Amino acid sequence: SKKQITLLFTAADRADGADAIISTLKKQGIKGAFFFTGEFYELYPDVVQRLLKEGHYVGSHSYGHLLYSPWGNRDSLLVTREEFEKDLLKSYEVMRKAGIEFKDAPLYIPPYEYYNRQIAAWAKNMGIQVVNFTAGTASNADYTTPDMKNYRSSQAIYDKILSVEAAEGLNGHLMLIHFGTDARRTDKFYKGHLERLIKVLKNKGYKFVPLREAVGI
């Protein structure tokens, strides 16, 4: 795979990273991919419009941020097919109100980035393709708060990403950053660390490409 990276952002009900992330991507000439819940579309219509105006991909992260499978038992389901489809269609209805047509947003990141083959098959049947971030860099730990066992500081995440790059490269990586995080986390990755990381990776010869180009859809 080529020396290219795609930045993904997900959010359920927080948008505190909006200004920092939008301006960083604009400054660096990068088109990101953003996945929001129905609640997010209803709470932050102005943020959604700003992202669309900048030419970013804006898609679904479900309507109600449902947990599809129990933690630790990915093969079983907590939702019926009907519940799954109803929730997802509802999210596309909310998106349509924001001016996002179904054909503009065929790629979907499930809630909690947690799903199984059955969910992917149900989505595919609706003409929707599930995507997920590339695991291993710990970029997605940027939501953790200091009281958590799995807490990682922004510097620790930054260092981990670069150590993975040094060891095996980040070719074709879909890197997940959270669009907003808990107020208890004052050390926000999107403030400073994200831009530093982008600059370092560009210097190493990486190109940041839009999601649809990366997955070819």
Task: Identify the role of each PLM range.
Residues 1-76, 90-106, 197-200, 216:
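Active-site beta->alpha N-cap acidic-glycine motif
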